[in-house]
């Protein structure tokens, strides 16, 4: 049976309304039409797309839970928090918003803007304006380099006269945006990233949403794929639980996992693909979670705070999450990577030190329970979001190219929504469509339906 895209979209609507079933712990199936490696946003999107056509799919996930880099922690503190991806974007076109509501979850606008701390005081209005002006100038310089197709580092094209605001601007555009310092980030990649100002939050957690959306999919958790044998006709996926024969496979693992060799390919995948993945290495971005009862910092619900800094040893705070006493200190880039390597104790010490610097030792002493993510040490992810190195922006398109009956998905394959769960989701749907076409299960209607990234183009900054 071949289904048209229009018929598929109707089936997708039915699938979204189906009762949610928990991922099966049944024995691993020995065959499927399409196997999906990874149960993050891209893998779940691909699986749902395939299920809507009535084709047989199996999702193979190395970790013991659904989510990938979207994990909501509901047990460490009284308040749930996202250990990884936190926001969605593009509310007018993002299908995940509708799916969240259909799943009974609450979506709401994320906090906009941030407060600036200068030493132990809040920035004055004029100082905030100066910072925003510096940020706009820095961003504009990167955009101009991108439009001129100068794929050098973002740092190399920055204005030289940002003064006291250079450190904060570089943090917000580099480590705080992509998990990499600007000297390690491609100007074209940064310039092509769609604006992400209209952020949307899921009150129950983005990880909770991905888990709910994946509960219908046939799932093998705690089952790392060790080898993929592929050709132009079929594939086989080897795991510790057995081998799966399929007509196609969609690989959604992170670029760092792909180049690590954790999954062997027979025959080897082309050097061109691995080179592309290596130029899209994951940045470092972690959260240090602190319980601060009594609001000793005097901040409001969901306040976002940064500091005027002349050093990369800095952070971003997301305070009083959801009106609770839980605060997140986010660190990234080279400093964040080095700090994470030192372990959770060192990360908590830095968070207390940072709070003491900005609010005083009494505020820092109010910290009670702490916890920290260490995504670089996660064996099934090995980092945060992909970020192209200088000269590497074209690698996203290369990485998305199918190889025989092997298809790749994940945020790293999206040219404008990279580093976002939205980009991961859309890439999974695209890869599923391509795989379904390859096996003859999907035929496009003459008038194709645009995706969220083609419905609304990014307007150039003025």
Residues covered by each model-derived region:
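Secretory targeting signals
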Residues: 1-3
């Amino acid at each position: 049976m071949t289904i048209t895209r229009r018929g598929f979209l109707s089936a997708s609507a039915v699938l979204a309304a189906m009762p949610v079933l928990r991922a099966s712990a049944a024995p691993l199936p020995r065959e499927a039409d399409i196997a999906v490696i990874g149960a993050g946003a891209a893998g779940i999107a691909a699986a749902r797309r395939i299920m809507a056509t009535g084709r047989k799919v199996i999702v193979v996930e190395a970790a013991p839970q659904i989510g990938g880099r979207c994990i909501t922690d509901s047990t460490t503190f009284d308040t749930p928090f996202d250990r990884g991806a936190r926001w969605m974007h593009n509310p007018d076109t993002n299908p995940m918003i509708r799916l969240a509501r259909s799943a009974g979850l609450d979506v709401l606008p994320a906090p906009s803007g941030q407060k600036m701390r200068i030493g132990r005081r809040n920035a004055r209005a004029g100082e905030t304006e100066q910072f925003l002006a510096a940020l706009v100038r820095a961003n504009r310089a990167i955009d101009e380099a991108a439009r001129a197709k100068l794929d050098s580092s973002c740092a190399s094209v920055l204005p030289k006269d940002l003064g006291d605001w250079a450190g904060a601007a570089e943090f917000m555009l580099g480590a705080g945006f992509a998990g990499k310092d600007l000297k390690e980030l491609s100007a074209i990649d940064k310039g092509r990233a769609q604006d992400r100002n209209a952020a949307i939050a899921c009150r129950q957690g983005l990880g909770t949403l991905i888990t709910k959306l994946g509960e219908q999919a046939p799932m093998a958790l705690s089952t790392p794929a060790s080898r993929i044998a592929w050709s132009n006709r079929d594939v086989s996926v080897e795991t510790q639980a057995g081998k799966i024969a399929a007509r196609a496979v969609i690989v959604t693992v992170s670029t760092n996992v792909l180049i690590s060799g954790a999954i062997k390919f027979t025959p080897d995948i082309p050097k061109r693909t691995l080179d592309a993945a290596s130029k899209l290495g994951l940045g470092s971005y972690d959260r240090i979670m602190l319980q601060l009862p009594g609001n000793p910092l005097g901040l409001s619900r969901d306040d976002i705070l940064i500091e005027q800094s002349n050093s990369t040893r800095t952070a971003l705070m997301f305070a009083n999450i959801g009106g609770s006493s839980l605060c997140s200190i986010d660190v990234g880039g080279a400093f964040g990577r080095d700090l994470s390597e030192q372990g959770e104790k060192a990360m908590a010490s830095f968070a207390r030190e940072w709070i003491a610097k900005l609010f005083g030792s009494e505020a820092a002493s109010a910290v009670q329970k702490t916890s920290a993510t260490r995504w670089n040490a996660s064996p099934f992810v090995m980092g945060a979001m992909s970020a192209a190195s200088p000269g590497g922006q074209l690698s996203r398109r290369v990485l998305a190219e199918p190889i025989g009956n092997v298809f790749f998905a994940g945020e790293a394959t999206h040219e404008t929504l990279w580093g976002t769960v939205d980009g991961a989701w859309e890439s999974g749907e695209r890869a599923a469509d391509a795989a379904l076409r390859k096996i003859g299960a999907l035929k496009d209607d003459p008038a194709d339906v645009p995706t969220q990234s083609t419905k609304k183009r990014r307007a150039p900054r003025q």
